[in-house]
A protein has these predicted regions:
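Helix-adjacent hinge/juxtasegments
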Residues: 59-84
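Catalytic-site beta-strand/loop segments enriched in glycine and acidic/polar residues
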Residues: 77-106
Length: 176
């Protein structure tokens, strides 16, 4: 993990980053000292293999067609000085590139206290792994292994009045 000094030791933090694999949340949590409450699509809670893991780490379930309760939970967590992680693309990448960001985090920030620090991050070197949505043709070119070098880069913080284009640019600058 590079840029760990950019993650505040205390206070509310909204971590926003790219979503390149199904295990991004675990990689980031293992590499950072603070507990991160990730926002996860409700479909994953319905899968037995993920359900117990997501409950154990205190992930927040979100259903896009009924996101109001999840939004209120996220705002409450931030107001309680927690770290909340969101993948604002809203899906695991199917191309390896950063997609357009959804608006949800802007709404969360508008309803949270002003002291929320927005911290961009990027997960690098997971595209083409077993855990990515890369096509089989790309996965075949990479030797299968559960061990691989992964780089997580944590960027400099942004203010709570940031917007999608600033966040996307910040995340994009951390990708390589």
């Amino acid at each position: 993990v590079s840029g760990i000094e950019n993650l505040p030791k205390h206070g509310p933090v909204l971590l926003l980053g790219n979503h390149i694999s199904y295990i991004d949340f675990a990689l980031i949590q293992w590499g950072t000292p603070r507990t991160i409450r990730f926002v996860v699509h409700d479909d994953y809670y319905r899968k037995p293999v993920f359900n117990w893991i997501l409950r154990a780490v205190g992930a927040v379930s979100i259903r896009p067609e009924n996101s109001r309760n999840a939004m209120q939970s996220i705002v409450s967590l931030l107001n309680d000085d927690c770290v909340v992680g969101i993948f604002p693309e809203g899906h695991v990448s199917t191309t390896g590139e950063l997609s357009d960001l959804k608006r949800g985090f802007e709404k969360i920030l508008s309803e949270s206290k002003d002291s929320v620090v927005v911290v961009p991050f990027a997960v690098n070197d997971m595209w083409g792994s077993f855990f990515s949505k890369a096509p089989k043709s790309i996965k075949k070119k990479k030797k299968f292994s559960f061990r691989r070098d992964v780089n997580i880069t944590i960027g400099k913080s942004l203010t709570s009045d940031t917007n999608r284009s600033e966040v996307k640019k910040s995340i994009g600058n951390l990708l390589f």
